[in-house]
């Protein structure tokens, strides 16, 4: 397994796919990194030379990835909550932030249902 930015990427996969194992790198960014490094997308990680791996590392290190990116996202959310914006309020309450409906659905964000017991209707 090759190690890039402290992450082990799988040897037997194509480089383009293997790079997506790093937080902050999707397919488009992986292709951009490989284009800058002038490496074929279809090459397998096990077939890369040490120079090519070093080149990928140097190009990838110019982006905000992994721990730094996670920290930036967390700080952005924290800032929204401190400022008191609507988005921050939704984060604080654990509800969907981007305008989705909550009457039905939104179970992923809200968690398991909390059922409320109804009062029994007394018959006359």
From Swiss-Prot:
Pfam families per record: Ribosomal_S13
Molecular functions per Gene Ontology:
rRNA binding; structural constituent of ribosome; tRNA binding
- InterPro entries reported in the protein's UniProt record: Rbsml_uS13_C, Ribosomal_uS13, Ribosomal_uS13-like_H2TH, Ribosomal_uS13_bac-type, Ribosomal_uS13_CS
Q: Which GO terms describe its cellular component?
A: cytosol; small ribosomal subunit
According to the UniProt entry, which residue ranges have a biased composition of type Basic residues? 92-117
Q: Its GO biological process terms? A: translation
* Annotated spans, Disordered: 92-124
**UniProtKB keywords:** Ribonucleoprotein, Ribosomal protein, RNA-binding, rRNA-binding, tRNA-binding
Q: Which HAMAP family match?
A: Ribosomal_uS13
Return the similarity comment: Belongs to the universal ribosomal protein uS13 family.
**Function of the protein:** Located at the top of the head of the 30S subunit, it contacts several helices of the 16S rRNA. In the 70S ribosome it contacts the 23S rRNA (bridge B1a) and protein L5 of the 50S subunit (bridge B1b), connecting the 2 subunits; these bridges are implicated in subunit movement. Contacts the tRNAs in the A and P-sites.
Q: How does it assemble?
A: Part of the 30S ribosomal subunit. Forms a loose heterodimer with protein S19. Forms two bridges to the 50S subunit in the 70S ribosome.
Q: What is this protein called?
A: Small ribosomal subunit protein uS13
């Amino acid at each position: 397994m090759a190690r890039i930015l402290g992450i082990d990427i799988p040897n037997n996969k194509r480089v383009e796919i293997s790079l997506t194992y790093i937080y902050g790198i999707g397919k488009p960014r992986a292709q951009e990194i490989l284009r800058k490094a002038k490496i074929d997308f279809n090459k397998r990680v096990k077939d890369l030379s040490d120079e090519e791996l070093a080149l990928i590392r140097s190009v990838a290190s110019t982006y905000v990835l992994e721990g730094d990116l996670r920290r930036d996202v967390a700080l952005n959310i924290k800032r929204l909550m401190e400022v008191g914006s609507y988005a921050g309020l939704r984060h604080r309450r654990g509800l969907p932030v981007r305008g989705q409906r909550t009457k039905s659905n939104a179970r992923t964000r809200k968690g398991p249902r909390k059922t409320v017991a109804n009062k029994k209707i007394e018959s006359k």
